[in-house]
From Swiss-Prot:
GO biological process, one term: glycine biosynthetic process from serine
Binding site for (6S)-5,6,7,8-tetrahydrofolate: L116, G120, H121, L122, S349, P350, F351
Job description of the protein: Catalyzes the reversible interconversion of serine and glycine with tetrahydrofolate (THF) serving as the one-carbon carrier. This reaction serves as the major source of one-carbon groups required for the biosynthesis of purines, thymidylate, methionine, and other important biomolecules. Also exhibits THF-independent aldolase activity toward beta-hydroxyamino acids, producing glycine and aldehydes, via a retro-aldol mechanism.
Family: Belongs to the SHMT family.
EC number from the UniProt entry: 2.1.2.1
Protein name, per record: Serine hydroxymethyltransferase
PANTHER family given in the database record: SERINE HYDROXYMETHYLTRANSFERASE, SERINE HYDROXYMETHYLTRANSFERASE 1
Enzyme class, first EC level, given as a word: transferase
Gene Ontology CC, one term: cytosol
Catalytic activity annotation: (6R)-5,10-methylene-5,6,7,8-tetrahydrofolate + glycine + H2O = (6S)-5,6,7,8-tetrahydrofolate + L-serine
Residues recorded with modification N6-(pyridoxal phosphate)lysine: K225
Pathway the protein contributes to: One-carbon metabolism; tetrahydrofolate interconversion; Amino-acid biosynthesis; glycine biosynthesis; glycine from L-serine: step 1/1
Length: 410
């Protein structure tokens, strides 16, 4: 019996999702498109195999082939970032972060990470997250004038808080992060330094953003986003921390690893080691900067921090007629996918927000160049300025879908 016949409901939903992905313009900064090889690995027979433990040190038999796959993933990841140690088993970035905390901290220890409205992630100390419940969390923000990291202010706060760990990295910050300055702050107050490079990992791998490996005590990341791999997480560190980090993943926070996902990671890391991956990463940044220019040239839409050095940026919509939620929903109707985003010192609910986040990793994978990116930004501006004009919005949707369909993904 075919897949379609066996479960027509699920089959139909997947087909519709495939069509949606092809006809829409994906601008959510945390999303990307994997290669067919990565997708094939995730659907392979490796999903049938349980393999608690680590390569060549398993608790189950029959692991000789998954050992090969996982070791390849480890070796490629270490080569990609110049790391002494790598763990490819975390199921997600959040679980990688949880394990990193567990390896270095005790419950109740203090952590200092970026606040949500400044661009940080839930797992960097937000009170609704385990990171803000298990640990005493404190957060730093941005300079109110430049909307960028103020390292002197962070250092002052670190001296006052005296955290056991400082967390650098963000999910919505468009400028270069100077990890060496965070290292100096951590050293001054006797703290561990953890870097979450989930969003910028692909840019780091391509040499287009400073590499935190070798600077931070521990580095975590997702494997999707700018790395274009399957959804999952990784941990990088020094060999001296290998035992405690391995134990924090298994048996500390996970059981059997997802070897079919690890196979996808191995393939994605191999792809990122190829010279053409740097070309891709360079185009990601060029596209983001081209889009940011369009918005900055308007009178009522502003790019937070003035621009971008990476794959994303946030738009301040406070001078328009729409909030973040309304803009996200509006753009959904014209086949452009974004997400609402809190701005520095946000006054609205996180379910509403005053801005949206834009990312170019996914459209660049589909072959969009600066001209295409500029076109997309202009369509967004038109939609926002004519949010109540059905005729204009229908035309924007036609143009967006036509552009998307000229760049089909694999």
């Amino acid at each position: 019996m075919s897949y379609q016949e066996l479960d027509p409901i699920v089959w139909s939903a997947i087909q519709q999702e495939s069509a949606r992905q092809n006809r829409t313009i994906e601008l959510i900064a945390s999303e990307n498109f994997t290669s067919q090889a990565v997708r094939a690995a995730q659907g392979s027979v490796l999903t049938n195999k349980y393999a608690e433990g680590y390569p060549y040190k398993r608790y189950y038999g029959g692991t000789e082939y998954v050992d090969v796959v996982e070791q390849v993933a480890i070796d490629r990841l270490k080569e990609l970032f110049g790391a002494e140690y790598a763990n490819v088993q975390p199921h997600s970035g959040s679980q990688a972060n949880a394990a990193a905390y567990m390896a270095f901290l005790k419950p109740g220890d203090k952590i200092l990470g970026m606040s949500l409205d400044a661009g940080g992630h839930l797992t960097h100390g937000a009170k609704v997250s385990f990171s803000g419940k298990v640990y005493e969390s404190h957060t730093y923000g941005l300079n109110s004038e430049t909307e960028t990291l103020d390292y002197e202010a962070i250092a002052k706060q670190a001296r006052e808080v005296k955290p056991q760990m400082i967390v650098a990295g963000a999910s919505a910050y468009s400028r270069i992060i100077e990890f060496d300055k965070f290292r100096a702050i951590a050293d001054e107050v006797g703290a561990y330094l953890m870097v979450d490079m989930a969003h910028i990992a692909g840019l780091v791998a391509a040499g287009l953003h400073p590499n935190p490996v070798g600077i931070a005590d521990v580095v975590t990341s997702t494997t999707h986003k700018t790395l274009r791999g399957p959804r999952g997480g990784v941990i990088l560190s020094q060999e001296k921390y290998a035992k405690q980090l391995n134990s924090a993943i298994f048996p500390g926070s996970q059981g059997g690893p997802l070897e079919h996902i690890i196979a996808g990671k191995a393939i994605a890391f191999g792809e990122a080691l190829q010279p053409k991956f740097k070309d891709y990463a360079q185009q990601v940044i060029k596209n983001a900067q081209a889009m940011a220019k369009v918005f900055n040239d308007t009178e009522d839409i502003r790019v937070v921090a003035g621009g971008t050095d990476n794959h994303l940026f946030n738009l301040d919509l406070t001078k328009t007629a729409l909030n973040g939620k309304q803009t996200q929903e509006l753009l959904d109707t014209v086949s452009i996918t974004t997400n609402k985003e809190a701005l520095p010192n946000e006054q609205l609910s996180p379910f509403v927000t005053s801005g949206i986040r834009i990312g170019t990793a996914a459209i660049t994978t589909r072959g969009f160049d600066e001209d295409d990116a500029t076109n997309v930004a202009e369509l967004i501006v038109t939609a926002i300025h004519h949010y109540d004009d059905e005729k204009v919005l229908k035309q924007v949707k036609r143009e967006a879908e036509a552009l998307a369909m000229t760049h089909l993904f694999e």
